[in-house]
Curated annotation (Swiss-Prot):
Keywords: Cytochrome c-type biogenesis, Membrane, Thylakoid, Transmembrane, Transmembrane helix. It comes from Prochlorococcus marinus (strain NATL1A). This is Cytochrome c biogenesis protein CcsA. Required during biogenesis of c-type cytochromes (cytochrome c6 and cytochrome f) at the step of heme attachment. It comes from the Bacteria. One of its GO terms (molecular function) is heme binding. The keyword Acetylation does not apply. It is found in: Cellular thylakoid membrane.
């Protein structure tokens, strides 16, 4: 590990880059709230989040160079990777809808993640260590990175669903906000087609409410996360069969990952087959948010099972 010392002061560039990312997210959060309150754009907050993502990218590359393996082998590295994924997912969502509401709702997730990694984890879990033999496999990058990216997309999608409750109160959703996205078009009732030239200007975009936009973007993010989670679970099963001769061992992490998959499968099922929109599917998405927290943080802190990084109760 690269570690500079000056007058008994230790400077770890990897940890410092994580702190820089935390600082930029910390500044971005109140700016997002002020933008929502003032009705201004979120370009400043978006710039800070993008800069934070660049810090995290540099941090992960540096840790990869230091350790010689993909930087996701302990809880600190995985939290930094999760924060990287969350900020990237947030930037993609804001590209689709440039509203300060997205930044105000999504930034706290990334801030808490990198804050937990930087200030709560003990120093021994922040340091890189050689991989155990079972993890020295090409499946490490495939399985773990895909799972972490799925968590990032699902967390951002779920927190956007929570935003549905915050921005529109008891307003009922119109069926026009299709689960397939917010790019629908309708024909204006105030204009008519000229029979001779069939003027296409009569086709005008629907104007969606903030809650409808959040609902649609949440659906898209969760769909992407669910697909990634499915790929991650399948790749994990293949890796487990190669390493231990068993596709599924009902390890605590595996069990909670399956519960997570089922919750989000129910979310997508209700939207696609029952036409649920707004608050009803949002409740399932929020439930999935807490299931991910238990699956990712809760099981790890107990220090049990093959997937745990360990901490409090790990002997």
């Amino acid at each position: 590990m690269v570690d500079f010392q000056l007058n008994n002061f230790s400077f770890d560039p990897v940890v410092s880059l994580g702190l820089a990312a935390f600082l930029f997210l910390l500044i971005a959060l109140p700016i997002s709230f002020w933008s929502v309150a003032g009705g201004s754009d979120s370009s400043k907050a978006r710039f800070l989040v993008a800069t934070s993502n660049l810090f995290l990218t540099s941090q992960l590359i540096l840790r990869w160079w230091q350790s010689g393996h993909f930087p996701i082998s302990n809880l600190y590295e995985s939290l930094c990777f999760l924060t990287w994924g969350c900020t990237l997912a947030q930037l993609f969502v804001e590209r689709a809808w440039r509203s300060p509401i997205v930044s105000a709702v999504a930034t706290p997730v990334s801030l808490l993640s990198i804050g937990f990694a930087s200030f709560v984890l003990p120093e021994n879990l922040q340091s890189s260590a050689p991989l155990v033999p079972a993890l020295r496999s090409s499946w490490l990058v495939m399985h773990v990175s895909v799972i972490m990216c799925s968590y990032a997309a699902l967390l951002i999608g779920s927190i956007l669903s929570f935003g549905v409750f915050l921005v529109d109160g008891k307003k009922q959703f119109n069926i026009r906000n299709s689960s397939f996205g917010s790019g629908s078009f309708r024909q204006s009732s105030e204009l008519y087609l000229d029979e001779r030239n069939e003027n296409l200007n009569s086709i005008q975009p629907i104007e969606f409410t903030n809650a409808e936009q959040l609902d649609s973007l949440s659906y898209r993010s969760i769909t992407a996360g669910f697909l990634l989670l499915t790929v991650g679970l399948i790749s994990g099963a293949v890796w487990a069969n190669e390493a231990w001769g068993s596709w599924w061992s009902w390890d605590p992490k595996e069990t909670w990952a399956l519960i997570c998959w089922l919750v989000y499968a129910a979310y997508l099922h209700t939207r696609l087959t029952r036409g649920w929109q707004g608050k009803k599917p949002a409740i399932l998405a929020i439930a999935g948010f807490f299931v991910i927290i238990v699956c990712y943080i809760g099981v790890n802190l107990l220090g049990v099972g093959l997937h745990s990084y360990g901490w409090f109760f790990d002997t």
